[in-house]
Amino acid sequence: MLMIRLSRRGARKQPHYRIVVIEKDRARDGRSVEVVGTYNPRTNPGSIELKRERVEYWVSKGAQMSDRVKKLWDKTPAAPASVA
């Protein structure tokens, strides 16, 4: 089963996270299928970058979001629809 969750990067006491698609039973920082975003909690407010279309793709394929990623997903504004 695939999960969309955080993978920790950065130095000690300076966390920076990648938002990754990964097998559920792999280690937190193990080999991921795809990196779909980043999260830096050290900025005020925390900076979040997400590839929304890729996250939606993986969710449509059955990937589950972790609780924290779900909260970050809700915080990020949806891209405005292009006016044709």
UniProtKB/Swiss-Prot annotation:
GO molecular function: structural constituent of ribosome
Annotated keywords: Ribonucleoprotein, Ribosomal protein
Family indicated by similarity: Belongs to the bacterial ribosomal protein bS16 family.
Annotated organism of origin: Koribacter versatilis (strain Ellin345)
InterPro entries according to UniProt: Ribosomal_bS16, Ribosomal_bS16_CS, Ribosomal_bS16_dom_sf
Encoding gene, per UniProt annotation: rpsP
GO biological process, one term: translation
Keyword Ribonucleoprotein: yes
HAMAP family: Ribosomal_bS16
NCBIfam families noted in UniProt: S16
A Pfam family recorded for this sequence: Ribosomal_S16
Protein name: Small ribosomal subunit protein bS16
GO CC aspect terms: cytoplasm; small ribosomal subunit
